């Protein structure tokens, strides 16, 4: 509980958000050692083969923004009643005794 109170005190003192504080802590903790990222480390070679971004630094990565839809009808807002479904066949009578 004391660590939570300390975190809240630090956030209030510096006026930063929790996300920013976590990023700062992770930057201090992350190893930027080139030996760990090289292909010559055989300790985790199997995992690295399956996960190509295994040694990618998370402090410098950003999330990709979604690309806006640029399709043929992206410029118009379609309402649900604009294109009603046409019935090409008469409705069936599925009653058992009909």
Swiss-Prot record:
PANTHER family: SPERMATOGENESIS-ASSOCIATED PROTEIN 45. The lineage of its organism: Eukaryota, Metazoa, Chordata, Craniata, Vertebrata. The gene is SPATA45. This is Spermatogenesis-associated protein 45. Belongs to the SPATA45 family. It comes from Homo sapiens (Human).
């Amino acid at each position: 509980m004391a660590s939570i109170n300390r975190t809240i005190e630090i956030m209030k003192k510096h006026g930063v958000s929790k996300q920013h504080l976590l990023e700062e802590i992770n930057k201090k903790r992350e190893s930027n050692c080139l030996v760990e990222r090289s292909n010559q480390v055989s300790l985790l070679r199997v995992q690295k083969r399956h996960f190509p971004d295994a040694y990618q630094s998370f402090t410098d990565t950003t999330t990709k923004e979604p690309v806006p839809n640029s399709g043929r009808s992206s410029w118009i807002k379609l309402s649900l009643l604009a294109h009603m479904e046409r019935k090409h066949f008469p409705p069936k009578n599925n009653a058992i005794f009909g």
